[in-house]
Amino acid sequence: IKDADLQEMIDSSERQIKNLANTIKTILITSKASESKLIINKEQIDIIELTKQAQEQIDINYASKPHAIGIHDHREENALVYADKYLIENVMHNLMENAVKYSDKEANVEVNIKQDEHFTIISVSDHGVGIDKKYQKKIFEQFYRIPATHHKSGYGIGLAMVKYAVKAHGGT
């Protein structure tokens, strides 16, 4: 085996291991939350840095798919956020990954971070076809997948985890 081929095999294995680890994390979070056993360990976190770390992982995992993720901090200052780093990192990763994964062509994803009087508001959007209204509530149910997306990899647990983690932080 040539060195370049060996390195590609190692890189591919590392990506697959990280993907499996993320899937296991999501399953554990969702399982604990559905049994009301989810423990929140809040600390001060830099939400921009956390979002950039999730973006870097997505950039690696989706290197062969054209995409761009823009992270926009609209707060007056880069204030720290009091949240569970582990949960919020998984939320950000899942939302951005879904935006890239389910875009048919080039995925242009926008992450906007704003601050109101009491909360940090995070929105993740893309310019894809959107989600049909009849599925918009169902997609947050554990193991639910929109029928037209079954050709993509996934288990229907990511958005359930997002819902549980966001609710645990007092969000919607």
Segments the model singles out, each with a brief description of its role:
Residues 99-100:
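Short helix-loop "hinge" at the ATP-lid/N-box region of the Bergerat-fold HATPase_c
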